[in-house]
């Protein structure tokens, strides 16, 4: 896909619970933008509360139906894309995400709107802004079933043995990502780390980053966990399990869902579950920041005013 000289892309990134949604909404309204989600949990249908998806039930935002055939998210009047893409038991590969996101960016630009890429999933973000050339390897169900039986620690050791550089790309705690990396290696016969070469940049991109201090992050995470539980997180998980979705499905294996499943199976008390969710979110923040800190292109902003100034200069 050729680079567009006129297409400008604003990326707003940051770790979980940093305030990306609030900032992106304010900027999007000011600059007539549409938001493309770069969140590996928001892609799943029926995962609303635990994914921190900006829906009415959790955050008092609006979900409007724009046609009988298609549902679009309108959060405070701002269109959101790549939310509710696949069911909980399906996988969206990075190559598939990139294809969908690029299509949305070009559609938004053709409407003379500014595309915003917003989220904390680094793989999604950098596949777009750095135009990663990703091999389109289809899922291998037999291999996945075999690998799924092994603990994450063992799988990660297998991955690093095959590709030492993969430790810089794959989260050692994310079993789903580890299995995907091993799957790609098995299909291509090449190291996973060598299969994400950068192509020619497709867009003129401004990267804005938002983060909180460790103390603020801890408080924000604890507050959000309480809000999720109050909004019905436990009932949401019960409903998903009742519908027949496996606890090992791609969606339910993530933070907020796996802890609640353990609670429902009486492996932990409610207070232990809350503590574990907060701890896992705090660890996620550290892993996300370890990645983002390496990118010197990110302009870290302290407030909305600073972000507006940078965005205004960029769009001009």
Predicted regions and their residues:
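Phosphate/pyrophosphate-binding catalytic cores of soluble transferases and nucleic-acid-acting enzymes
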Residues: 1-316
């Amino acid at each position: 896909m050729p680079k567009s000289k006129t297409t400008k892309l604003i990326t707003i990134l940051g770790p979980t619970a940093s305030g990306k949604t609030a900032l992106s909404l304010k900027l999007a309204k000011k600059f007539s933008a549409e938001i493309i989600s770069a969140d590996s949990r928001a892609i799943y249908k029926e995962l609303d509360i635990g994914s921190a998806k900006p829906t009415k039930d959790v955050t008092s935002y609006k979900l409007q139906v724009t046609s009988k055939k298609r549902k679009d998210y309108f959060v405070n009047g701002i269109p959101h894309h790549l939310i509710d893409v696949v069911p909980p038991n399906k996988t969206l590969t990075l190559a598939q995400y990139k294809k969908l996101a690029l299509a949305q960016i070009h559609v938004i630009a053709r409407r003379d709107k500014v595309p915003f890429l917003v989220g904390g999933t680094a793989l999604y973000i950098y596949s777009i802004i750095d135009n990663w050339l990703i091999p389109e390897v289809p899922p291998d169900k037999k291999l996945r079933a075999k690998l799924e039986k092994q603990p994450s620690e063992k799988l990660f050791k297998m991955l690093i043995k095959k590709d030492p550089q993969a430790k810089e790309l794959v989260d050692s705690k994310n079993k789903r990502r580890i299995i995907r990396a091993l799957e790609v290696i098995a299909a291509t016969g090449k190291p996973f780390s060598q299969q994400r070469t950068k192509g020619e940049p497709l867009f003129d991109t401004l990267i804005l980053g938002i983060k909180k201090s460790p103390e603020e992050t801890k408080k924000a995470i604890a507050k959000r966990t309480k809000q999720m539980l109050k909004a019905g997180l436990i009932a949401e998980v019960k409903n998903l399990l009742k519908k027949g979705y496996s606890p090992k499905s791609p969606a339910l294996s993530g933070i907020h869902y796996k802890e609640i499943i353990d609670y429902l199976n009486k492996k932990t008390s409610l207070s232990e579950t809350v503590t574990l969710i907060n701890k896992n979110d705090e660890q996620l923040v550290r892993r996300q920041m370890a990645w983002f800190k390496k990118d010197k292109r990110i302009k870290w902003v302290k407030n909305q005013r600073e972000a507006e100034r940078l965005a205004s200069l960029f769009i001009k």
